[in-house]
């Protein structure tokens, strides 16, 4: 008789969760407002090409992000990452401050 070895998957749910967590969306933008407690408003700018005329236009989106330590100030360039819903409007959190406002 021949014995067969079963291949067991060494991947755990925790490892899958860690991979998913590292695969979240990230954006770089400028802090527009830091007046709220533990919350910043970040403006993310992007360029898009007009579908008919081909001109490049600048568009912006604003995101409310969680800033646990109230570290960011207006004008700072920051990196934000998508996260679970923290409140009605907050689905992003501050990862790092890239450049301080001058």
UniProtKB/Swiss-Prot annotation:
Q: Which molecular function terms from Gene Ontology are attached?
A: rRNA binding; structural constituent of ribosome
The GO annotation for biological process reads:
translation
* Region Disordered: start-end pairs: 1-27
Q: Entry's PROSITE patterns?
A: RIBOSOMAL_S17 (PS00056)
- Which InterPro entries does the record cross-reference, listed alphabetically? NA-bd_OB-fold (IPR012340), Ribosomal_uS17 (IPR000266), Ribosomal_uS17_bact/chlr (IPR019984), Ribosomal_uS17_CS (IPR019979)
Gene3D superfamilies assigned: Nucleic acid-binding proteins (2.40.50.140)
| Keywords (A to Z) from UniProt | Ribonucleoprotein, Ribosomal protein, RNA-binding, rRNA-binding
What Pfam families is this protein classified in?
Ribosomal_S17
Q: Could you state one GO cellular component term attached to this entry?
A: cytosolic small ribosomal subunit
Quote the HAMAP family the UniProt record gives. Answer: Ribosomal_uS17_B (MF_01345_B)
- What is this protein's function per UniProt? One of the primary rRNA binding proteins, it binds specifically to the 5'-end of 16S ribosomal RNA.
How the protein assembles, per its UniProt entry? Part of the 30S ribosomal subunit.
UniProt lists the family membership as follows: Belongs to the universal ribosomal protein uS17 family.
Q: What is the recorded name of this protein?
A: Small ribosomal subunit protein uS17
Q: Upper lineage ranks?
A: Bacteria, Pseudomonadati, Rhodothermota, Rhodothermia, Rhodothermales
């Amino acid at each position: 008789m021949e014995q067969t070895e079963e291949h067991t998957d060494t991947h755990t749910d925790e490892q899958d969760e860690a991979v998913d967590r590292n695969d979240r969306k990230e954006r770089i933008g400028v802090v527009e407002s830091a007046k709220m407690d533990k919350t910043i408003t970040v403006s993310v700018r992007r360029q898009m090409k007009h579908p008919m005329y081909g001109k490049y236009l600048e568009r912006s989106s604003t995101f409310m992000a969680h800033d646990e330590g109230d570290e960011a100030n207006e004008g700072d360039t920051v990196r934000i990452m998508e996260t679970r819903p923290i409140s009605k409007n907050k689905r992003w959190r501050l990862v790092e401050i890239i450049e301080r406002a001058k």
